[in-house]
Regions:
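Conserved ATP-binding/catalytic motifs of P-loop helicase motor domains
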Residues: 1-195
Length: 195
């Protein structure tokens, strides 16, 4: 049994979020824990597949198949526990107004993920890992990213969880040209940047 219902992992690009997901997926495989990787866009799903996370789907295709195909649900029936890794979570809206065919509609993407999964996945223990960059702009018409807010899950869904932020960027050499330019820009604008 999982002690909590969700975990939020944040960090800037290059901080190792995808590596954490890959390592967690390896642990799932070792211990026969079911898992599914999801991404907000098709491009992000493709990137994760190319990084070794071959079962990654878009959130929309996941929700569609859960609600439409009973055979799709059967593949989860032999697992006691299941973990969902959801990348690009900073883009997931909940309650925002979107315009489809020039008509305003409310978009409850986060609710769709949560309720569709709990309704259709027959596992006793379901756990969500929301992964994203909290420094990105929030979804349209939002003041913050609901899928990266621990308190939002507690208040809206009554779930228990924890969060962690990766702060060190590993992808770039600290003395790369991009890093130097960014550091100089920040120093010139009186930001607190270590020399």
């Amino acid at each position: 049994n999982f002690e909590n219902d969700f975990f939020i992992l944040t960090g800037p690009a290059g901080s190792g979020k995808t590596e954490v997901i890959k390592n967690a997926v390896d642990i799932c495989k070792e211990h026969n824990i079911g898992y599914q990787c999801l991404a907000f866009t098709g491009r992000a799903a493709s990137v994760l597949r190319n990084r070794g996370l071959g079962n990654t789907r878009t959130i929309d295709s996941w929700i569609y198949q859960l609600n439409k195909e009973s055979t799709f649900k059967e593949k989860f029936s032999d697992k006691d526990s299941f973990i969902f890794f959801i990348d690009e979570s900073s883009m997931i809206s909940n309650g925002a107004v979107v315009f489809e065919n020039k008509e305003p509609e409310l978009d409850f993407k986060l609710d769709e993920i949560m309720w569709s999964t709990y309704r259709h996945i027959p596992c006793k223990n379901i756990f969500f890992v929301f992964v994203g960059d909290s420094n990105q702009l929030p979804p349209l018409k939002h003041e913050y990213c609901p899928a990266l807010d621990e308190n939002y899950f507690i208040k809206r869904y009554g779930l228990r969880g924890a969060s962690h932020e990766l702060s060190k960027v590993h992808r770039q050499n600290l003395e790369s040209e991009i890093t130097k330019v960014a550091k100089n820009f920040m120093l010139q604008n009186n930001q607190s940047v270590k020399k």
